[in-house]
Amino acid sequence: MNNEDSLSYSFGRMMLNQQQHHHQQQNNTQVQQQQQQHTTQFNQVRFGGNYHQQHQQQQHHQQQHHQQQQQQQQQQQQQQQHPQQYISPTFSYVHNNSNTSITHGNLYDIDDNQIDNVNIIRGGNRGYYNQQQQQHQHQQQQYYHEQQQQHFNINNNNNNSNNNNNNNNNNNNNNNNNNNNNNNNNNNNNNNSSLITNSHHAQRIVSPIVNGMTSSSGSNMMINDVSFGMNGISSINGISINNGSGDIDEEDDKLLDEQQQLLQRSLERLSDGEEISFGNPNYFFHPFSERNINGLPSTNSSIVSRQQQLQQQQQKLKLKSSPSPISPFFYTQQQQQQQQQQQQQQQQQQQQQQQQQQQQQQQQQQQQNTSINGIIKIDQTPPTPQYIANPSVSPLNAPISSPVLGDIYSGNNNNNNINTNNYRQQQKLNTSTGSYQNMSFDAGVNGFNWSPSLQPDQSTSTNHTQAMLQQQQQRQQQQQQQTQNLVYLNNQQIKSTVTSNRDHWSSVVKPPPIQLQQNSMQQNPIQQQQQQQQQQQQQSLLQHQQMLQMQMQIQQQQQQQQQQQQQQQQQQNQQQNQQQNQQQNQQQNQQHYPNQHHGQHQHNQHNQHHNQHHNQSHPNHKNQHQKQNQTQQSTQQQQQQQQNVQTSTTQSPLLQQSQQPQQQQPPTSNQRQQQQHNNNTNNVTTINNQTNINIINNDSDNEELLTTVNHSKPPPNESKRGELVESPVSKQQYKHFIKQFKLKEKEGLEIAMEFAFQSLSVLPEKVHWRVYLELADLANRQNNLKLARKFYRKVTSTQPYISQGWLEYAKMEEDYGRLEKCQKILQLGLKHCPFNESLLIKGIRHEEKMDNLEGARALLSQLRDQSIYKTWRAVMEGGLLEARAGNIDVARKIFKYLMKHVPWYGPIYQEAYKLEERCEEYERAINIVEKGLFEDPKYGPLWFSALRLYEKTSHGFLQSTRNTVERARQAVSREVTWKIYFEAAQIEERSKNLTLSRAAYVKSVELCPENLLWKVWLGGSRTELNADNICIARKLVFRALEEVPSKLRSLVLLEYSRLEEYAGNINKSRRILKMAHVEARLDWKVFLESVLLEMRANNYEAAIKEAKESLKIHSGAGRLWAALIQLNQLKGVKSQLNVFKKALQFVPKSGEVWCEGARIALNNNELREARRFLEFAIQFTPQFGDSFIELLRLEIMEKGPNCDISKLEQLCINADPNYGFMWLHCTVCVLDSSRQVLRNAKKLLLEMTQPKEQYLEEKKPEYGSCWVGSDGVLSLNRVFRNDFNNMSNQEKRKALFGSDVVKP
């Protein structure tokens, strides 16, 4: 090398070094800022808490560092000659015995014995840093950056001289890797030195958990990835630990010397022409920006790598512009480029030859290797237009290979694939020849495959398009032939053919992976023009393809229309032929009619002879029908086969897999019966269509069969059933009408009727029956019976197949006491809707009300031929009918039959259990409940029934009951679990186990939803009140008031007022009820409680006043009228009768009012009237228990103490009453059955009732001041006339709360 060349080379290198140094400083400042942001975010997530103090200290030190940059630049040369000792900042863990400092990393290896002696010092509460150490840190960073810059300069020059210009991107990456691996080499060569790391991120990464680590000094050993050196410096997983021995200055000098030696060795290797193996990680230093911290990659790595690439590209451009070569290896690179160009030319020639061969094979195998739809399958996504125009521009436009066949193309596919340029040329050749396919998605064996759309150029003529249309028609014909053949193939054969075609075409069409070169980034203007022309051609080709697709769709539609017309003509011809045959058969049967009195054998022979004669006389006619049927069957089979093949090919494997489990599910019993019924009807019609032989008999059954077979007109019922379906538009119109009609109702009946009649002209006919139904209801509420009947008749005439009209009409007649007319209406409705469950149940109950059990059983007998799965609800009503009639054995058989055939319906087991419980057969009831729980373990009511039964049969031993609670908790859903614990708490309360009851309430609170917690607090308050813990009960009521919804607040206020009354605070109770009158004005129970409060306090005048004020607001509350009747007994019988008559005008169906009328009749010794009134009371309100007790008293007065009350017990069992003052007085326990309460009432009546004669003798006028009856009769004076304060606590609670049991 000459002196001038060496001088120019050294001068250029100095200039480049200065520029690189300037750029590197700017980059370092940016990188440091970004690193600081990253460390702040990372440490906030890692440590949290008091990290802001550390961050402020770092910012302050950074400002000092920027001020000292100029001074440091001047001292760089001195630092290179005499480097200072740089020490990485560390966390200091001060041990009491020995000074052990851990730089950063994992603390899992510290011994447990050392934990107590380790003090973690981290800035304030978190960590601590020395300012001197931070200054050393900044100096250390600058020192290593300068070394890296020098290393970059040398390596860039050498690598640019050695490598080709086409591989600039690789060289940039190699330089980065060289620099990255240099540090690793330095660190690996020095076994006894500590790793001095840049601790911007790592200095705060300290694991919070400390596990066993043993330390030793003076020997090299590894324990759990812990290395200990001879110089006293140990490392844990690559992290240095200083044990206090050794000099850091000497180690740094050694490191610097070793780094300089490595640099010299790398330069010597480059000068010798050796290639650097980038796979070796020990060559160059690994920069901090690309490190991973605790598995998290640094965010600055991408920024630094981009900046380095830009700098290296600028250097290379400058080096290219220099006239003199930098290294003697430049000429060798030119030779290598020439050799590469020659090799590329040879490859292109070989590829052109392969293209010609492939095109010939492609044309020959297009018809063979097409899919079922005639479309080639290619296992890749479609290439974008940019990729077709210039495939070497960007890899983002390249087609993506299919993931389904990734195992086939996973290796080096250079031999199996062709170049992208050849692929583009092949597409152009295909467009010029016109051999293209439409782009479509076709489902192959392994998934969706794309077939490319290679369209002809814009220069194609109309003749060419016509030829293409003809080719497509030919292909369709070939497809039809192929599909007919493919039907008879097995699924495996079809799969094999599809996969073979796919594998063949994928090797031809699939492009290889694209390798980008740097020359492709620079495009000539000529190439750009070519790209624009190609894009324009592609757009025109797309438009042309759309036009062709539209033409093909129009042709397909025309063909389908022609096929439909032909099918219709064939069907018409068949119908005409059938009609002619039927007419001929009828004429011949009329001739043979006199021979009808012969035996059945002769009649069959005659029919056979007639059929033979008909077949002989018309052989051609029969053959024609058979041929037509055969052709129809063949066409139908072909269509079905084509559809099956298309669906199998178009559906993806995932969809087929999702459909397979649905097909494998067994059909339900209802579906099986429907399938059998449809199969039978289809078989009958197919046989008649194929044979055209109708065996005609003159019986009525055969005539009905002929009407169904000959497709005669449907009966009028069927024509009107089609009108039941209402469109969404008609429903929306009806909703709009109802809103306006409700507003017109308030103005009056006439205005509403006028509006309704006007709306009939606008509304559709399908909705007219609903309008008439609303008008009938309005007339009924206005007590216009005649008008209501007219409208109901209009409803039943327009839509007789809707049960709602019949039910409303029958209910109106029943309300007016016309039971016979109601019966006729229900019978007429069942003729039109014979198997409607609501009509059947209503009819059965009405027949039972009329004491016509035979009529009810006759209605049930109609269901004999019907499926149990459609009529099981009506059958269950029949079982309840027999149970109410006292036929217990028949009812048990019916329920047993239902439990066998409908085991999945829980209410069947519930009704069967109630039947056995009413009969006091508790063991049978338990067996039924357990059987039901086995079939449906998540049905909650059965679990509550089981708890009730086990508590009844426990006799104080609750082990089985508690086991049932645990079973129920595991079986039911979480929404019901809190109710199980609530019931368990009440069970424990009744057995006097308050601790267990409170524990169960606590569990109920834990599992109860927030909107229902008030019920648990209310139940707990009632429990504490029964235990006379009034303070705790009051607190729980307050808690319930806080959480109860506003709509149910009145219930909690009632509980609060009763609690204060029980505690003796009557005035406070009155104030609470007054507040409840304002908040819950619509709740009549609040007003009734005010009346009862005054009655219990013996303030009868105030009670009468409260009752009259309450009736002004709630005139429809029967219990308020009953209380007013009781209070007017003090004023005499006449006043009582006047109130009774007035009450019947407002509440004619109130059982409480009729019961008070019966008491008035009993006091006046009018026993017949009393019995009649009590029957009304039981009929209208069967839940009111006082009616049954008064009826029992009437029976004892008439028939004596030894009277038979079995019918009364059965009546009481069927009604199952649950409230009433006298009823609750006779109830000993909540678990008592209706029969047990009635027996208790009889005992009390016999003990307290005097004989009838004495009763009549002692009846005096002054007894009118009594409540009901004399003192010796069980009457209300036991409840009210006694002083409330003199009662026991149990009697007070019974009088206060009555039947209001808190239920979950």
Swiss-Prot record:
InterPro entries: HAT, Syf1-like, TPR-like_helical_dom_sf, TPR_rpt. Residues 19-85, 153-195, 296-334, 447-477, 576-687, 706-728 are annotated as: Disordered. Residues 296-306, 448-465 have a biased composition (Polar residues). Keywords: Repeat, TPR repeat. GO terms for biological process: mRNA splicing, via spliceosome. It comes from the Eukaryota. SMART domains: HAT, TPR. TPR repeats lie at residues 769-802, 899-932, 978-1011, 1046-1079, 1084-1111, 1112-1150, 1152-1184. Residues 25-44, 52-85, 153-194, 307-316, 466-477, 576-597, 626-687 have a biased composition (Low complexity). Residues 598-625 have a biased composition (Basic residues). Gene3D superfamilies: Tetratricopeptide repeat domain. This is TPR-containing protein DDB_G0280363. It comes from Dictyostelium discoideum (Social amoeba).
